[in-house]
Amino acid sequence: MRAALLYLRDSNFEPAAAQALATNPRFGALYETLAHYATITRRSHEAADFARRAVALQPRLWRAHLSLGMSLLRLGRMEEGRAAVEKSFAGDPFNVWAKNTLDLLDSMRDFRETRRGAFVIKADAKESDVLAPYAAELLEEAAAKLTAKYRFTPQGPVTVELFTNHGKYHKEVYTLP
């Protein structure tokens, strides 16, 4: 936890991590914990890197595979992310987060991507032709206003997913069975 505290303070956490690994060189949970804190502070690239380190140290740490998969999905690396989530679920078939994530990804197989400017809009193929142009216009308008207001431009592309069934999305992402 000391390494995580230092990480959250943007301090050098490596000496604390090295100390923990000196006690147990296969302590993947160290980097899985760092991945968790990177995730909740919206540092997906760092979360993925930490999760990879956790998996390298402790290959059967299934929650680290899930953390890696979720981070990769957030980064838009869908195939690699799905593979990591599948590996997590194969190792721990009782993990509801892994199961629900795989169900959600399955429900998105028929989605079509529309790229416009800094945005990637994903919607059901049956609705994409109708929704994507309106969504793109709204997103570009909102982005212009928010970029000016907050003086921040997100690194693109920004992915927006449109679901026809809000209840399914909500169930898959936010709840347990």
What are the functions of these language-model segments?
Residues 1-2, 33, 67, 101:
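Canonical tetratricopeptide repeat
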Residues 5-6, 37, 71:
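Residue-level signature for tetratricopeptide repeat
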Residues 7-10, 41, 75:
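Structural motif corresponding to the intra-repeat A-B loop/turn of tetratricopeptide repeats
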Residues 15, 111-177:
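Juxtacatalytic substrate-recognition/specificity segment
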Residues 19-20, 53-54, 87-88:
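Canonical positions in the second alpha-helix
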Residues 28-29, 62-63, 96:
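Helix-start (N-cap) detector for alpha-helical repeat units in TPR-like alpha-solenoids
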